């Protein structure tokens, strides 16, 4: 399955609680909670580029499945992680006590991030 495309956030659950759990300042949480960000994904074999635009903030991360890489987290912090593919439609990684699962189903992408007992879920649609 090729994951390439542009996707816009449609819904999100537990945004504020998750952002607080990862240390995001309250003023940034309030500014970002209603932004319907756009993610552009470019896949070339096992290599991926994610360009995430939320308001004026742009985060660009590149990785190759199964290889350690450095990525920018939503807090602006640089993290090291290894992204794995599970089955035909899931990208999974764990970093700093956070498990991230991105699942592709047709034109819908469901991203779930879990830290402790706080689960943040974001659903995006292809645009």
Swiss-Prot record:
The modification Phosphoserine is found at residues 39, 56, 100. The modification N-acetylmethionine is found at residue 1. Pfam families: Lipocalin_7. Its main location: cytoplasm. The modification Deamidated asparagine is found at residue 105. The modification N6-succinyllysine is found at residues 31, 36, 46, 57, 78, 90, 121. GO terms for molecular function: antioxidant activity; chromatin binding; fatty acid binding. GO terms for biological process: cellular response to hydrogen peroxide; cellular response to hypoxia; fatty acid transport. Keywords: Acetylation, Cytoplasm, Isopeptide bond, Lipid-binding, Phosphoprotein, Transport. This is Fatty acid-binding protein, liver. The lineage of its organism: Eukaryota, Metazoa, Chordata, Craniata, Vertebrata. The gene is FABP1.
